Amino acid sequence: MLLAERVPAQGRVLVLGAGGGLELKAFAEAQPGWQLLGVDPAAPMLALAEQTLGPLMSHVQLLEGYIDDAPDLRFDAASCLLTLHFLDAGQRLHTLRELHRRLQPGAPLVVAHHSVPQDPAGKRRWLQRYAAFGEASGVARADAQRAIEAIAERLPLLAPEQEVALLQEAGFDDVELFYAGFSFKGWVAYAK
């Protein structure tokens, strides 16, 4: 929906962190005229994406690699879901700049990933809330606790205000929060 506000019926959309293809499938089904490029560093995930997409592959090109491997085309939009939280601030800024470089002026970028306050108490509180939500959804308490410990130790999480600042530094404006669910946040921003 956020991309469709500005992407033409025959638009080109870059999906960074394409994973198993669920996002690509949703786009291809909702917007059959779009040409989609899915980029992901994991060949097994791209193989799964191909299976997930089935006959919709006629609208999709898959590329194994990172943003630097994506063609230097001007896309009408891009998305990057559940990916940026794996990158430290420097890598994240580089990735956002490279996404920006591949977008038409005014093109939307949708990102969503873990983002929590960086003060120790705030970070702990939001991760505990995420674990509690998991438990309420049927995840075993021990598994939920292990998950948030792994997130805290392994992911270079940034605060929401840092995320907005990086988007702006990379050349995006009109940054808007469109989703907040415990530790997950989503923003839409537009290439200048």
Regions found by a protein language model. Give the residues of each.
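C-terminal alpha-helical "lid/dimerization" subdomain adjacent to the S-adenosyl-L-methionine
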Residues: 114-168
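A short glycine-rich, Lys/Arg-flanked "PGG" loop and its adjoining helix->strand segment in the class I
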Residues: 93-105
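Class I SAM-dependent methyltransferase SAM/SAH-binding core
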Residues: 12-14, 20-69
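Core SAM-dependent methyltransferase catalytic element
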Residues: 170-192
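A short beta-strand submotif of the Rossmann-like class I SAM-dependent methyltransferase core
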Residues: 80-83
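A short acidic, Gly/Pro-enriched loop at the edge of an enzyme's catalytic core
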Residues: 70-78
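Conserved beta-strand signature within the Rossmann-like core of class I S-adenosyl-L-methionine
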Residues: 106-114
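Conserved alpha-helix/loop element of class I SAM-dependent methyltransferases that forms part
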Residues: 1-10
